[in-house]
């Protein structure tokens, strides 16, 4: 297409309120994120009702800041992209209703975006020349997916968690060893001081050894049992060793399955996405194992790994180019699956 397509994107699926202006799916003019971490920290996790109320408070300001930083006005926008699932229903509704109101008032197309597709699309921002096909590992607090991206907007789910998401397991273990919220970065930090081989925590074993699914509930239970036994015996607990050993089990599972997926699909490229993609151990292990297996491993910069609207703007662009827009009847779908519309 001759004309640049400017998309105003909005993300409010959990506890970040974000707005961004993205051009042609890959160029970010602005990406404003208002985080609620400090608010939810005292509760030990995200409180949905509190998150929704905070989204309502800040969304107008966040959108205005995104336009100001991009040095454009509403009349320069060509379309509105917005997350409509998966996520917390109350949080999703705030961003969705705001986007629908803008779409109606400005008479601009509305493009509903799957949050998981947004995470995958963060790699198109980071790597301007990236094109399908490739394998993508989406790993965050609420989701763990192993996906084969055949073409823009076309996904085949190769594996997913059967219980806890990887990031959810991190949060629970962080809480158990007294590190607080958010758990992922804190476990990652303290793990650097520990011995990853100190404790042998088991990985899930499936009867079907061909599956690329994940399971972290057994690992989580094993860590909790270890901590309980130590506590009952009144023995000292080396938090760094626990964190490092737990992290090694999680990371090796994620990396091994991802490399197996590449062999299955005969591709040599893995894109990693989602909040856990910022994890230093995951990045280092992928870099090492990718090199050994002659597989290119791509990571977005950390700001694009967290929930943000720039990734939603990128995904919205590729949906729009495939002829997909949404009506003003679009509703929030908290349990939206990858590939569903």
From Swiss-Prot:
GO CC terms in record:
cytoplasm
Q: Which cofactor does it need?
A: Fe(2+)
What is this protein's record name? tRNA N6-adenosine threonylcarbamoyltransferase
Catalysed reaction equations from the record: L-threonylcarbamoyladenylate + adenosine(37) in tRNA = N(6)-L-threonylcarbamoyladenosine(37) in tRNA + AMP + H(+)
| Main location group | cytoplasm
Instruction: Relate the protein's function as given in its record.
Output: Required for the formation of a threonylcarbamoyl group on adenosine at position 37 (t(6)A37) in tRNAs that read codons beginning with adenine. Is involved in the transfer of the threonylcarbamoyl moiety of threonylcarbamoyl-AMP (TC-AMP) to the N6 group of A37, together with TsaE and TsaB. TsaD likely plays a direct catalytic role in this reaction.
What start-end ranges are recorded for coiled-coil regions in this protein?
A: none
Q: Which SUPFAM superfamilies match?
A: Actin-like ATPase domain
Gene Ontology molecular function? iron ion binding; N(6)-L-threonylcarbamoyladenine synthase activity
State where substrate binds: 138-142, 171, 184, 188, 279
